[in-house]
C-alpha cells in the first residue's frame, strides 16, 4: 500500500458503523482492517476480491462504475475503483439513520488521492 493511501485510511478510521475495510492494490495484493470479531480476514479479503471482479466485469458491457454499493440485511458493502486499478471496499453496518453520505464522501476522497 502506498504511503499516501495508508495515511489516508489511517487518518479517517474507524468511522462510526465501520465494520472493516480492504484495500486492493493493482497487483492484487490486499491490506485490510477489521473493527469487529464477526468478520474474519479471509472473509474480508475474499469478499473484496469478488466485488472488485464483479465491478471489473461490468467494463465488458461498457459500464464503468466508480462506486458501487451492495445492501444486505446487516451490512452495506461499498466499493470504489481508482483509475490505477486499486480499489477500496468498506464494510459498513446497515443501521437505520446511519449517515451513509459520509461513507460516499470517503470513497470520493479515495478516488481522488
What are the functions of these language-model segments?
Residues 1-25, 29-113:
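Non-catalytic interaction/Regulatory regions outside core domains
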Amino acid at each position: 500500500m502506498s504511503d499516501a493511501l495508508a495515511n489516508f485510511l489511517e487518518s479517517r478510521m474507524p468511522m462510526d458503523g465501520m465494520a472493516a475495510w480492504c484495500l486492493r492494490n493493482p497487483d492484487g495484493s490486499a491490506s485490510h482492517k477489521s473493527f469487529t470479531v464477526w468478520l474474519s480476514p479471509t472473509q474480508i479479503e475474499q469478499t473484496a476480491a469478488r466485488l472488485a471482479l464483479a465491478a471489473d466485469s461490468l467494463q465488458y458491457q461498457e459500464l464503468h462504475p466508480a462506486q458501487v454499493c451492495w445492501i444486505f440485511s446487516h451490512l452495506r458493502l461499498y466499493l470504489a475503483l481508482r483509475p490505477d486499478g486499486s480499489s477500496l471496499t468498506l464494510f459498513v453496518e446497515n443501521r437505520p439513520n446511519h449517515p451513509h453520505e459520509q461513507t460516499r464522501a470517503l470513497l470520493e476522497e479515495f478516488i481522488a488521492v
